[in-house]
């Protein structure tokens, strides 16, 4: 994917002036960043966007903070195992395009091949019992052996054991984060996150530097389910 397209999406999400579901709706209707950017301003006015939003959508925003953050993300993506996957990219998961609010761009750290596998979502409580965590670990191993890639949220409890079950069976796993790609939460999962980078991928839709705001976690769940052909919520007991 060319850097101009990535830069366009990065400026949009960094500005926080246009909700991601609205960006997604535009992409579903017009097909690409290029098609959206080339629409006449009057079309955006008819759709109810204000002047600042129209400037962003037309690619003419001059907001320095947004531009600087976007440039830092491009620099991040120039390093080994770091990727920016835009909506138009061949590496963008096809199932994720089908949801109403698919992210316009994904930050990926690890293996791109893991994005296009057959995923199964395995999630649950952070405050799970030993029994619940044991079940999550076992189910992750069995599903992995059956050819499915476990997708979860890197949280404590069930999510962590699901990732560990997949990794310990020698298979890849995908972790969808509720922070920027450059910040692991909880911090106690840094070693697990590194294992996932080496045998799967960390994924985030959020701008770099985004802290673990509580609202981020329900929001990222749509990506976990959107990536998967099926899902299972493991009870904490």
What is the role of each PLM region?
Residues 1-5, 84-237:
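Glycine-biased, small-residue-rich flexible motifs in mid-sequence functional cores and linkers
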Residues 1-88:
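Short, small/acidic-rich helices and loops at N termini and domain boundaries
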């Amino acid at each position: 994917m060319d850097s101009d397209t990535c830069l366009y999406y990065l400026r949009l999400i960094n500005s926080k002036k246009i909700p991601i579901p609205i960006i997604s709706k535009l992409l579903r209707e017009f097909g690409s960043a290029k098609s959206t950017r080339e629409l006449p301003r009057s079309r955006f006015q008819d759709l109810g966007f204000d002047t600042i939003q129209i400037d962003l959508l037309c690619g003419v925003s001059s907001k320095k903070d947004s531009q600087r953050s976007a440039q830092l993300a491009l620099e991040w993506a120039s390093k080994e195992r770091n990727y920016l996957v835009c909506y138009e990219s061949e590496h963008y998961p096809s199932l994720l395009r089908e949801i109403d609010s698919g992210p316009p761009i994904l930050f990926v750290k690890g293996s791109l091949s893991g994005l296009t596998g057959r995923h199964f979502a395995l999630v649950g409580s952070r405050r799970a019992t030993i029994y619940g965590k044991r079940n999550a670990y076992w189910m992750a191993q069995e599903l992995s052996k059956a050819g499915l890639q476990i997708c979860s949220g890197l949280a404590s409890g069930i999510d962590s054991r699901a990732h560990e079950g997949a990794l310990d069976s020698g298979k890849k796993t995908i972790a969808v984060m509720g922070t920027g790609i450059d910040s692991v939460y909880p911090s106690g999962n840094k070693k697990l996150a590194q294992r996932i980078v080496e045998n799967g991928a960390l994924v985030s839709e959020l701008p770099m530097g985004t802290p673990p705001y509580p609202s981020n976690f329900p929001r990222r769940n749509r990506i976990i389910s959107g990536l998967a052909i099926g899902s299972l919520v493991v009870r904490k007991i």
